[in-house]
């Protein structure tokens, strides 16, 4: 009995490419998958992450095998965690016969916060990205990116005004290359402590009074926030390299204020 699968199907991807040009990254982008992430309190958060998965393609291959990325992500019906991140990446590089690989996993992470006066609790969400890379020679590198919403209040506005000062919500983003485990909560707490005031999911009137006055008593330019955060990141031994950036969504302008500091401690060592 003849079957369509009885005859060999050509593997076009494995055929030789005459242009002889290597590709740095090729793969799949924006695929969602359930993940689990351990929190600092000993619990596990179940969430959904957006994945980008790439490998380097040698100059002599026409294409990569796109279906294998999906197979790796879904293998054993497992949920991806930070603990399984490196093994998954190494499996991807091996199965696709590549020397380099890159996986990004972006997901919402929730922290239960208590309001500063009433103590009422509510969830705050933070955008987190885990990035793993396999470099030539097999070296693994892990980077964590956390976007932290905060409040900033303008020192100049406070100084020149008879009363009040303009303030706004800001996003402070820390991207850190790690040499050891660092909790998401630690990064959030570090950033929030350097803002004019924290942002909360739920506030009662006494809390609203507190955060308004707290921001007024603690004005920060966008430059101040990135410098203050960078000063603490410089002391964190679990971080090899970092970028800290702040975008202030100005309340009196139709544009944002922005600042960025980057440092690689490994180069300076």
From Swiss-Prot:
It catalyses: GTP + H2O = 7,8-dihydroneopterin 3'-triphosphate + formate + H(+). Its EC number is 3.5.4.16. The keyword Hydrolase applies. The record marks 154 as: May be catalytically important. It is an enzyme of class 3 (hydrolase). It comes from the Bacteria. GO terms for molecular function: GTP cyclohydrolase I activity. GO terms for biological process: tetrahydrofolate biosynthetic process. It holds the Pfam family GCHY-1. Keywords: Hydrolase. Pathway: Cofactor biosynthesis; 7,8-dihydroneopterin triphosphate biosynthesis; 7,8-dihydroneopterin triphosphate from GTP: step 1/1. Converts GTP to 7,8-dihydroneopterin triphosphate. Belongs to the GTP cyclohydrolase IV family. This is GTP cyclohydrolase FolE2. It comes from Azoarcus sp. (strain BH72). The gene is folE2.
């Amino acid at each position: 009995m003849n079957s369509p699968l009885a005859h060999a199907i050509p593997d076009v991807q494995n055929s030789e490419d005459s242009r002889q040009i290597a590709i740095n990254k090729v793969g799949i982008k924006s695929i969602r998958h359930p993940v689990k992430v351990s929190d600092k309190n000993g619990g596990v958060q179940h969430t959904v992450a957006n994945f980008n998965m790439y490998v380097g393609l040698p100059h002599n291959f026409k294409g990569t095998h796109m279906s294998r990325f999906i197979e790796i992500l879904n293998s054993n019906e497992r949920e991806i965690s930070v603990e399984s991140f490196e093994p998954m990446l190494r499996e991807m590089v091996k199965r696709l016969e590549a020397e380099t690989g890159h996986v990004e996993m972006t997901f919402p992470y929730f922290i239960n916060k208590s309001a500063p006066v009433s103590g009422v609790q509510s969830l705050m969400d933070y955008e987190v990205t885990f990035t793993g890379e396999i470099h030539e020679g097999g070296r693994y590198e892990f980077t964590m990116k956390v976007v932290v919403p905060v409040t900033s209040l303008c020192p100049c506005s406070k100084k020149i005004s008879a009363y009040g000062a303009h303030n706004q919500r800001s996003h402070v983003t820390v991207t850190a290359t790690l040499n050891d485990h660092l909790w998401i909560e630690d990064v959030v707490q570090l950033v929030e402590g350097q803002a004019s005031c924290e942002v909360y999911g739920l506030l009662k009137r006494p809390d609203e009074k507190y955060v308004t006055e707290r921001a007024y008593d603690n004005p920060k330019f966008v430059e101040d926030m990135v410098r203050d955060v960078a000063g603490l990141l410089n002391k964190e031994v679990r971080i090899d390299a970092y970028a800290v950036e702040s975008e202030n969504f100005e309340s009196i302008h139709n544009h944002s204020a922005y600042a960025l500091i980057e440092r690689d401690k490994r180069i300076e060592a």
